[in-house]
């Protein structure tokens, strides 16, 4: 039967993707418990609440995975991992009628647990099951119901033929389901209650559907044990279902394959706790913590114990991870089965937390699977196991049998190479090496004895020089300390004392290390109390100098450097040296190792990592008082490795043999390296900062001003008509009363004042600038005319008011003021920059209509005022005249105040030195933005109201406050946003284009660290960002915003090609091998022309490369760069292309600017900067670089490949 005709839509996780998942988990710093708590808490606003015991869909699964990995996981990886958790978990509430029968037909190949060796090809089965589920939801009953029996007779023939095809698998499936669904974990048969390892594909791995009985779980077993385990599972069931299952198949089985393409596994859900358990195996941490976390996670009823199903679910995920890690599942399964039997110490059918942790910690393969750290030292004699694949035939040191397997065959101790099977590791003796002695006065003398490990010797005997035949079984002996290999028969002729071999002066023997005395241990505990909180090693050690000629190595390894080769080198050094000489920098830093070696008079430090690792160790050495300053060597594991190139250690570790490297460190010479101190001081912003006028902003203003004077012709005609009507009305009302005319004059004056104060700020801005187009000239001319007209109107109105003349003067002033107000309104509409034609048109029409209505109301009031005035004059006499004189004097004072306010607003517009506001208010009277001025109030304030003058003054004060707020300087950026990564320069410091590339590189690496897992990938990414920066040119015209002073002499950066970057070089190589200072052509010509008897030629004029200034009369063309001369080199970079040309050799060097001992750099804007490859964005500041000190470094010996007879003659 072949139902997998069509290819599945989704594939499971491949081994390559599993390695990628492991790598992503190693980059992450998030804790799985914290991520689960965030997803389970109801306060998480960004993500919906997830129940740990519930199921999640693909979207929730991907959010959880991204949160744990602290980056965006690849989509294909997330899909395939999600599918690996699917399984056909059938429940009574979800299977109806013929869906059960069709599922039973498929169950012969359906095993969808998270990927084991027997779960391949299960996705098509799941697809078929899920596709058939909607069709069966409406018909038939549940499992064992009457609906399935009712339709059995009509399909008897179909059932008969189908059962013949699948060989009775339906009955077996029914038998298994009927017994297991009613199974009670607390009620078991004669078999041990914890031993329920079954091959049922329906109960292995995470569930595909929502299960109504979550306790029904079991472990997918090996195919070789399927028959026995199946019967064993049946015996464990205390009850059997009395119902029968009748198969009803309407469609041919070939139709199942056709429906595969319509099924999408992403519509299903997977259990969240299975996902968490699976990921916890990949998370770094202590095995004890992982065991407790798994226990709490699967203890769904919170009763403090695990039953059989919960135990099986945990082991299920361990089996899935074990296969991807290269385990032989057939070897691991018996170990887990034995553990499940022995873990229940009180035989009560359940496992408590103590029993679970005790059983887990005594199962060595389980500890390796849980992620036990293979680099953490334990007590002497305890092996540090590591799962290993052997390229040559290997034999178990315990059972003496060969390790057989396709993947990783067995466990090997990292420290002594003791090798065992997984099944034998439980009984392996604690025979590992001793790394220290407990007393300074050993009982059996102070000599170190050989530590022999038998078997797996591939080489020649150190005594008889004959090859050791290790292919035929356990034969041969190897000393762990001196690495001497002997035949078994030759071992008796060798002394018992070990000499530590060829590199004895580099190794600290165990006899030289002992626990620290109490007083020192107490001081160390107090000094390192914070650093030791997360470490469980309570004993501190001290080293006694073993010999006057010894110079031991102190090795620091950074496993997270760019090449990701640290773990391998760490294990090799732990085997070649004393393990207490090797430290992992990711676990506490370098202080622990430096504290142990600080009293030694001679030792050397080896940094396995990039340039940042070297800087980290140098910084730690500054904080510790050492008896002597050790020399530092470098094994390049980083991306750039510029310092390693300068010291001849190469641009990257190429897998060279560790003994050869140790020989180079022994023969290396010592040189001095300068270190420079850098001080960065932020520049405070000046109070009178003005916005810089650029060409773009200037053209934008020209466009706005040219649009502001455009007025619709129809609106102009309407305005002129209304103005003519107002003049006629004013002329006809020649008999109006003086009080009424004064009131109207005051009203129009108030309107003019508010309009002028609102709009003269923007219109006078145009006056202060140089007019370049016709539109600007028009605006300026209209503004000047308006100012003159308003002054004339104010003078005439004030004179007419003070004189108290009758109707004629008031009528003229009234007409004049009305026309001026209309003109002000016209220019107001013109001076405001138009946002849209419709808005201006509507606002202007509204203004004209309001003016027309006001004129009509004034005409009616004046007609009523004439009649009332005649009656009052006839009835009143002298008292009325006195009151009128008092009112007129009060009105004169108010008019004088208004005149002063308008004059003040006009005078403010004439001052060019004061800051101006380029933005005007909207024409509709609303506040458009922060720079706009408040619009005119709806009800104008007249001088007859009591608070008229005070209201106008308040408006003026508010406007002045707004102008002051607009001109405040920008808030200074906080120091936290631009933190300098280092205060010491070891390699180089740069500003500009190269730092901009580095900023982009680091931001992308923090977002997607899995894309930067090799040196080649890092260089390709760097090239991509350099290409984009070439076109972006974000740091062009650097000379306009930076000043450089070298030893008191300012450099003229504007002389010559414009620069985009400046770099200060302490070492010759930067950016992964670029020699920016370069070796000039003149030096090459001198070296080639000067023979053994020849004289050097003079430099030609074309060979000289001058700097921007004649810097202290030093000819920079012949200046030689040296990282120990207490001088720093300053070079300029034109662009990214310039850097590439220097890197490829098309150009000799960068632009040499200076060679000095002190540099001061002042920047005027924010620039990208970097120190030794660590970038950041720096606001305007002052940078001072001075010499700090010198440290000894190890220079590798020259390569011997070039030596020979002909090279000797030519040298």
Swiss-Prot record:
DAGKc domain sequence ranges: 548-682
Gene Ontology MF terms in the entry: ATP binding; ATP-dependent diacylglycerol kinase activity; calcium ion binding; zinc ion binding
Tissues expressing this chain: In 10-11 hours embryos, expression is abundant in a limited number of cells in the procephalic region and in the ventral nerve cord. Predominantly expressed in the adult nervous system and muscle: including compound eyes, brain cortex, fibrillar muscle, and tubular muscle.
Residue stretches of biased makeup (Low complexity): 231-244, 795-805, 931-958
Amino acid composition bias (Basic and acidic residues), ranges on this chain: 826-841
Cellular-component GO terms for this entry: plasma membrane
Region (Disordered), start-end ranges: 174-244, 789-841, 874-893, 910-958
Function of the protein: Upon cell stimulation converts the second messenger diacylglycerol into phosphatidate, initiating the resynthesis of phosphatidylinositols and attenuating protein kinase C activity. May have a role in the development of the embryonic nervous system and the function of the adult nervous system and muscle; regulating signal transduction in neurons.
Record's protein name: Diacylglycerol kinase 1
């Amino acid at each position: 039967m072949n139902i997998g005709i069509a290819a599945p839509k989704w594939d499971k996780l491949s081994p390559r993707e599993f390695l990628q998942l492991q790598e992503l988990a190693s980059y992450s710093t998030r804790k799985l418990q914290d991520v689960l708590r965030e997803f389970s808490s109801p306060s998480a606003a960004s993500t919906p609440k997830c129940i740990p015991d519930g199921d999640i869909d693909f979207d929730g699964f991907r959010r959880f995975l991204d949160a744990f990995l602290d980056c965006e996981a690849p989509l294909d990886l997330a899909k395939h991992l999600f599918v690996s958790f699917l399984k056909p978990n059938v429940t009574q509430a979800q299977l109806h009628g013929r869906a059960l029968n069709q599922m039973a037909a498929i169950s012969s190949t359906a095993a969808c647990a998270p990927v084991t060796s027997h779960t391949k090809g299960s996705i098509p089965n799941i697809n078929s099951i899920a596709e058939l589920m909607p069709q069966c939801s409406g018909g038939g009953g549940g499992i064992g119901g009457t609906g399935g029996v009712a339709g059995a007779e009509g399909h008897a023939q179909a059932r008969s033929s189908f059962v013949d095809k699948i060989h009775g698998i339906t009955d077996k499936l029914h038998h298994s389901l009927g017994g297991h669904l009613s199974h009670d974990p607390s009620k078991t048969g004669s078999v041990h209650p914890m031993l329920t390892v079954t091959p049922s594909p329906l109960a292995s791995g995470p569930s595909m559907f929502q299960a109504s009985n979550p306790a029904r779980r079991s472990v997918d077993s090996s195919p070789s044990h399927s028959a026995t385990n199946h019967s064993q599972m049946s015996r464990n069931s205390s009850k059997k279902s009395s119902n029968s299952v009748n198969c009803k198949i309407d469609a041919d089985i070939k139709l199942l394959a056709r429906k595969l393409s319509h099924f999408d596994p992403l519509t299903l859900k997977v259990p969240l706790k299975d996902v968490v358990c699976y990921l916890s195996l990949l998370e770094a941490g202590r095995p004890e913590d992982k065991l407790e976390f798994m226990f709490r996670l699967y203890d769904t009823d919170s009763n403090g114990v695990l039953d059989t199903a919960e135990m099986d679910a945990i082991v299920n995920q361990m089996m899935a991870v074990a296969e991807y890690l290269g385990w032989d599942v057939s070897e691991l399964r018996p170990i887990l089965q034995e553990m499940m039997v022995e873990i229940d110490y009180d035989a009560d059918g359940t496992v408590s937390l103590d029993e679970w942790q005790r059983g887990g910690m005594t199962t060595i393969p389980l500890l390796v699977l849980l992620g036990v750290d293979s680099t953490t030292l334990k007590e002497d004699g305890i092996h540090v196991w590591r799962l290993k694949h052997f390229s040559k035939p290997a034999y178990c040191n315990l059972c003496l049998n060969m390790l057989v397997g396709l993947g990783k065959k067995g466990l090997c101790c990292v420290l002594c190479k003791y090798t065992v099977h997984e099944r034998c590791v439980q009984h392996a003796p604690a025979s590992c090496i001793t790394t220290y002695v407990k007393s300074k006065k050993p009982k059996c003398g102070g000599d170190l004895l050989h530590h022999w490990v038998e078997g797996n010797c591939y080489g020649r005997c150190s005594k008889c020089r004959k090859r050791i035949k290790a292919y035929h079984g356990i034969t041969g002996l190897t000393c762990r300390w001196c690495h001497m290999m002997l035949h078994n028969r030759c071992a008796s002729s060798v002394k018992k004392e070990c000499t530590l071999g060829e590199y004895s002066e580099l190794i600290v023997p165990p006899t030289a290390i002992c626990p620290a005395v109490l007083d020192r241990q107490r001081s160390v505990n107090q000094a390192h109390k914070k650093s030791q909180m997360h470490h469980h090693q309570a004993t501190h050690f001290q080293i006694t100098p073993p010999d006057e000629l010894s110079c031991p190595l102190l090795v620091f390894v950074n496993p997270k450097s760019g090449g990701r080769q640290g773990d391998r080198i760490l294990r090799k050094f732990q085997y070649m040296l004393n393990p207490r000489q090797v430290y992992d920098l990711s676990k506490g830093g370098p202080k622990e190792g430096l504290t142990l070696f600080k009293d030694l008079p001679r030792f050397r430090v080896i940094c396995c990592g990039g340039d940042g690792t070297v800087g980290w160790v140098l910084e730690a050495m500054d904080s510790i008082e050492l008896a002597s300053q050790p020399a530092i060597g470098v094994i390049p594991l980083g991306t750039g490795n510029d310092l390693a190139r300068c010291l001849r250690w190469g641009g990257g570790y190429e897998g060279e043999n560790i003994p050869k490297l140790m020989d180079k460190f022994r023969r290396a010479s010592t040189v001095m390296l300068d270190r420079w101190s850098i001080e960065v001081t932020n520049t405070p912003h000046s109070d009178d900062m003005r916005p810089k006028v650029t060409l773009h902003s200037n053209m934008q203003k020209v466009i706005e001003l040219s649009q502001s004077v455009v007025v619709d012709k129809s609106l102009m005609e309407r305005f002129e008509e209304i103005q003519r009507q107002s003049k006629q009305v004013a002329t006809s009302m020649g008999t109006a009363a003086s009080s009424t005319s004064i009131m109207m004059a005051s009203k129009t004056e108030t309107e003019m004042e508010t309009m002028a104060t609102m709009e003269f700020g923007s219109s006078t801005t145009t006056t202060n600038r140089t007019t370049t187009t016709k539109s600007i000239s028009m605006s300026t001319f209209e503004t000047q005319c308006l100012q003159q007209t308003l002054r004339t109107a104010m003078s005439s109105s004030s004179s007419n008011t003070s004189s108290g003349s009758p109707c004629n003067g008031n009528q003229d002033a009234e007409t004049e003021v009305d026309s001026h107000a209309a003109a002000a309104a016209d220019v107001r509409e013109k001076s405001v920059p138009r946002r849209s034609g419709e808005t201006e048109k509507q606002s202007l029409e509204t203004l004209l209509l309001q003016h027309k209505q006001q004129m009509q109301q004034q005409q009616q009031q004046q007609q009523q005022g004439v009649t009332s005035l005649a009656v009052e004059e006839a009835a009143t006499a002298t008292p009325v005249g006195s009151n009128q004189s008092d009112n007129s004097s009060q009105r004169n004072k108010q008019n004088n105040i208004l005149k002063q306010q308008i004059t003040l607003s006009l005078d403010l517009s004439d001052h060019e030195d004061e800051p101006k506001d380029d933005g005007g208010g909207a024409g509709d009277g609303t506040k458009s933005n922060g720079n706009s001025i408040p619009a005119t109030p709806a009800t104008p304030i007249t001088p007859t109201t009591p608070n008229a003058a005070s209201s106008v003054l308040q408006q003026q004060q508010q406007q002045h406050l707004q102008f002051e707020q607009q001109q405040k300087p920008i808030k200074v950026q906080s120091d936290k946003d631009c933190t300098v990564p280092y205060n010491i320069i070891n390699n180089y410091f740069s500003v500009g284009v190269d730092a901009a590339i580095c900023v982009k590189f680091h931001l992308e690496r923090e977002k997607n660290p899995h894309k930067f897992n090799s040196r080649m990938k890092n260089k390709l990414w760097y090239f991509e960002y350099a290409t984009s920066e070439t076109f972006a040119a974000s740091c062009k015209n650097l000379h306009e915003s930076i000043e450089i002073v070298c030893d008191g002499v300012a450099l003229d950066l504007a002389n010559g090609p414009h620069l985009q970057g400046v770099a200060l070089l302490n070492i010759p190589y930067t950016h992964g091998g670029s020699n920016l200072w370069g070796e000039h052509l003149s030096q090459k010509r001198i070296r080639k022309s000067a023979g053994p008897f020849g004289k050097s030629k003079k430099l030609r004029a074309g060979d000289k490369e001058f700097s921007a200034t004649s810097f202290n009369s030093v000819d920079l063309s012949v200046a030689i760069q040296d990282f120990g001369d207490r001088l720093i080199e300053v070079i300029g970079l034109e662009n990214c292309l310039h850097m590439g040309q220097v890197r490829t050799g098309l150009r000799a060097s960068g632009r040499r600017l200076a060679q000095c001992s002190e540099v001061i750099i002042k920047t005027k804007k924010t620039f990208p900067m970097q120190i030794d490859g660590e970038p950041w964005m720096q606001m305007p500041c002052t940078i001072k670089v001075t010499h700090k000190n010198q440290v000894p470094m190890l220079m590798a010996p020259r390569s011997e490949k070039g030596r020979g007879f002909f090279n000797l003659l030519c040298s």
